[in-house]
C-alpha cells in the first residue's frame, strides 16, 4: 500500500479513536495516539492477516504488550474488517466483548495482555513455535517505553537472542511519557539502544510519527540474520490532537465536549486534505 494511502487510513483511525474514547468516557488516549501509525502500518502493509480467517495458521502474530492502549487496536481491527463498527461502539458498555485491555474474545486478538512486561515473553514463545514447526509467519510485539522498567522483558530479551529468533520483531513506542511524568524522571531509558544491542538484538530506530519512515524501517528488516529485531519508534504522546501532544496527563483521559469537537475538527481537516491529495494523483 502506498504511503499516502496509509497516512489517510491512519488519520481515519485517529478520528475513530477519538470518537470511541469520548463515547465510552474512558481510554488511554495519549498512548493510543502515539502508536496508531505503527498499528496502521502493521495491519495494512506489513503483516499477513485475513479478517475472514482470523485463525489462519499462516497469519503473522501481533501482541499488544502495552495492553492499556487497546482502543488503538480496536479501531485498527475495525478498519481492517475483524470487528464491526457496531461492536466497536459497545466499548465501555456492560456485556461488551471489548474491555479496557485486549482479550481473545475479540477476533484478531492473539492473547490477553495488560499486565505490563509480559507481552514479549509471549512473543518469544510464538516465534519459537514457528521455528519448531518450520512455519514462516512473523511475530510482532508492541511495548511501551514506560514498560521497559519491567524486569521480565529482559529475561525474554535473553531468550530471543539465545534461540536466534530472527522471525520476532519487538517495537518500543518511545513517546517519553508515562502516567507519572517523563520516563527519564521515573526510570532513565537513554541507554535503550545500547542495552538491547548488548542483549544481541538487531536494533533499528525510526520516526513513529512519520509513516514513510515507519514503512522504510519495517521493510529494511533482515529476517535471515539470526537475530531478533527491536524497533525504537520515536513518537509523540497524543499525536495528532494538538492540545494532547506531549502532555503526560493525557496518558489516560477523556475530552470534554468542547475538546472532542476540536479534536474531530483537527483530524477531519487532515483527512480532507489527504483525500484531495490522493484523488489528485
Curated annotation (Swiss-Prot):
One of its GO terms (molecular function) is transferase activity. It catalyses: apulose 4-phosphate + D-glyceraldehyde 3-phosphate = D-xylulose 5-phosphate + dihydroxyacetone phosphate. Gene3D superfamilies: 3.40.50.970. It is an enzyme of class 2 (transferase). Its cofactor is thiamine diphosphate. Pfam families: Transketolase_N. Its EC number is 2.2.1.13. Keywords: Carbohydrate metabolism, Thiamine pyrophosphate, Transferase. The keyword Nucleotide-binding does not apply. It comes from the Bacteria. InterPro entries: THDP-binding, Transketolase_N. Pathway: Carbohydrate metabolism. The keyword Transferase applies. PANTHER family: TRANSKETOLASE N-TERMINAL SECTION-RELATED. Belongs to the transketolase family. Involved in catabolism of D-apiose. Catalyzes the transfer of the glycolaldehyde group from apulose-4-phosphate to D-glyceraldehyde 3-phosphate, generating dihydroxyacetone phosphate and D-xylulose-5-phosphate. Probable heterodimer composed of AptA and AptB. This is Apulose-4-phosphate transketolase subunit A.
Amino acid at each position: 500500500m502506498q504511503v499516502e494511502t496509509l497516512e489517510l487510513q491512519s488519520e481515519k483511525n485517529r478520528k475513530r479513536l477519538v470518537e470511541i474514547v469520548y463515547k465510552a468516557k474512558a481510554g488511554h488516549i495519549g498512548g493510543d495516539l502515539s502508536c496508531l501509525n505503527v498499528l496502521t502500518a502493521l495491519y495494512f502493509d506489513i503483516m499477513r492477516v485475513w479478517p475472514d480467517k482470523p485463525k489462519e495458521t499462516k497469519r503473522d502474530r501481533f501482541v499488544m504488550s502495552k495492553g492499556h492502549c487497546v482502543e488503538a487496536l480496536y479501531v485498527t481491527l475495525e478498519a481492517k474488517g475483524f470487528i464491526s463498527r457496531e461492536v466497536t461502539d459497545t466499548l465501555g458498555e456492560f456485556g461488551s466483548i471489548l474491555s479496557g485491555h485486549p482479550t481473545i474474545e475479540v477476533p484478531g486478538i492473539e492473547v490477553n495482555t495488560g499486565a505490563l512486561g509480559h507481552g514479549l515473553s509471549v512473543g518469544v514463545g510464538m516465534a519459537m513455535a514457528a521455528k519448531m514447526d518450520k512455519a514462516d509467519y512473523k511475530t510482532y510485539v508492541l511495548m511501551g517505553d514506560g514498560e521497559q522498567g519491567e524486569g521480565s522483558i529482559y529475561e525474554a530479551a535473553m531468550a530471543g537472542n539465545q534461540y536466534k529468533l530472527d522471525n520476532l520483531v519487538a517495537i518500543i513506542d518511545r513517546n517519553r511519557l508515562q502516567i507519572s511524568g517523563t520516563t527519564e524522571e521515573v526510570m532513565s531509558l537513554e541507554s535503550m539502544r545500547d542495552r538491547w544491542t548488548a542483549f544481541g538484538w538487531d536494533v533499528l530506530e525510526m520516526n513513529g510519527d512519520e509513516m514513510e519512515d515507519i514503512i522504510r524501517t519495517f521493510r529494511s528488516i533482515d529476517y535471515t540474520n539470526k537475530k531478533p529485531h527491536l524497533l525504537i519508534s520515536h513518537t509523540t504522546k497524543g499525536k495528532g490532537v494538538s492540545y494532547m501532544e506531549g502532555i503526560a496527563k493525557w496518558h489516560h483521559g477523556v475530552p470534554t465536549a468542547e475538546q472532542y469537537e476540536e479534536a474531530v475538527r483537527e483530524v477531519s481537516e487532515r483527512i480532507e486534505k489527504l483525500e484531495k491529495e490522493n484523488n489528485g494523483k
